[in-house]
A protein has these predicted regions:
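Surface-exposed coil loops of outer-membrane beta-barrel proteins
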Residues: 1-88, 155-166
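Outer-membrane beta-barrel pore domains
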Residues: 56-217
């Protein structure tokens, strides 16, 4: 369930629901020496409060608080349940007519869990992006070019739309293009390393090239 409100330049939302237990926190699992996997499993009640405020016609700030009432943490045979709180704050601003900048920082209070090589799993992270122009699926020929840097700890966020944005420290360069109405082509390249090792062999390099076409109905 969600309740939203708006007052002048202030927007907000209150949310309550339940997350599926088939996912782990940030979609990240860790390998142990016996070949098994462990992580922080969801399947718990979730509540959040979000606020956004327009400081000016070109700048907005936002903050979110979220709480998972009970997360099941399975760590190398040591299972326990814990409530987890999340905080996030960020902003976006228009630097020039065709240039925008955004940045966000997130953190949770889930700690004391180690990764596949014994290091504590990082529970905070940040993301920033610089974007030239904006694409619009209804505007044929519109495009955007973007670059971003992320340092996203595996326990700094509940989940993301795509797994390759989680537990990653590195750069992305890409573009969006609208070849026909209600269609977008996106191409990007991401390079970096894992924040925490998910394999007993240590942190792995991350190199992703992706091209996709999206349709809007």
């Amino acid at each position: 369930a969600e309740y939203t409100f708006e007052a002048d330049d202030l927007f907000g939302a209150l949310t309550n629901g339940r997350l599926k237990d088939s996912r782990t926190l940030a979609g990240t699992k860790f390998e142990n020496k016996s070949g098994g996997e462990y992580g922080a499993y969801l399947g718990t009640e979730y509540s959040s409060a979000r606020l956004k405020y327009n400081l000016s016609p070109v700048t907005a700030i936002g903050a979110t608080y979220g709480r998972l009432n009970e997360v099941t943490v399975a760590e190398k045979g040591n299972n326990f349940q814990d409530s987890v709180n999340f905080w996030e704050a960020g902003f976006n601003t228009k630097l020039a007519d065709n240039l925008t900048l955004m940045a966000a920082y997130s953190k949770s209070d889930l700690d004391g869990v180690t990764d596949s090589v014994g290091s504590e799993v990082v529970n905070d992270g940040w993301f920033s992006e610089l974007r030239y122009k904006q694409h619009n699926p209804s505007d044929v020929g519109s495009f955007a070019i973007f670059t971003n840097y992320r340092n996203v700890g595996a326990f700094s966020t509940i989940d993301a739309t795509v797994d390759y944005t989680e537990n990653v420290r590195g750069w992305t360069l890409g573009f969006d293009y609208v070849p026909m109405e209600n269609t977008t082509i996106e191409v990007f390249y991401t390079t970096g390393t894992q924040v925490n090792a998910t394999s007993t062999e240590g942190r792995q390099d991350v190199d992703i090239f992706r091209a996709q076409m999206e349709f809007y109905f």
